[in-house]
Amino acid sequence: SRALALLRAVFDLKLTERLREAEGFTYSAFNSSTTSDVYPDYGYLWVGVDVRLENVDATYAAIDELAAALAAGEITEDEVLRARRPLLEQIEDAFENNGAWLNWLSQSWDKPERLDRIRALASDYAEISRDELIEMAADYLQPEASWRVTILPRDAE
């Protein structure tokens, strides 16, 4: 969903501020979201971080705190605007790019309704409210539903 993509962008801002700027654990935390065209309620949001071995536990703790804060509604209007602006700029650039249109059209030949969704991209993102993001964060960022994968060097204890 577009709201999940915008929530991902807000989370990305918070990850950068906390993990890079405040803690210095990593230069670039990254995250992504996935939804399904087939299963309307299916989707997830994930975070990836490359950190030094001694910072793994503290990094998990920081990510948990950020997710809990988002789920508790700690999203400002300024964060929504700062997260939305680059998405709208990417959409504007894509609409001016033949490659983007070729990709969209190739995905729409069997589902022409996708073209309406493409045309509504910018307005959909512009209409997502802070309250919608807070509701989505409360749904998606529940600690009991989270999974962790840690990849360590072979010689790590």
Where would I find each of the regions flagged by the language model?
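Low-complexity, intrinsically disordered Gly/Pro/Thr-rich segments
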Residues: 130-138
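M16 family metallopeptidases and their MPP-like homologs
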Residues: 20-127, 144-153
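Amphipathic alpha-helical interaction/coupling elements
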Residues: 6, 83-86, 136
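Short, conserved catalytic/metal-binding micro-motifs enriched in Asp/Glu and His
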Residues: 5, 133, 148
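His/Glu-based metal-binding/catalytic segments typifying zinc-dependent metallopeptidases
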Residues: 1-14
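Carboxylate-rich, divalent-cation-coordinating active-site regions
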Residues: 17
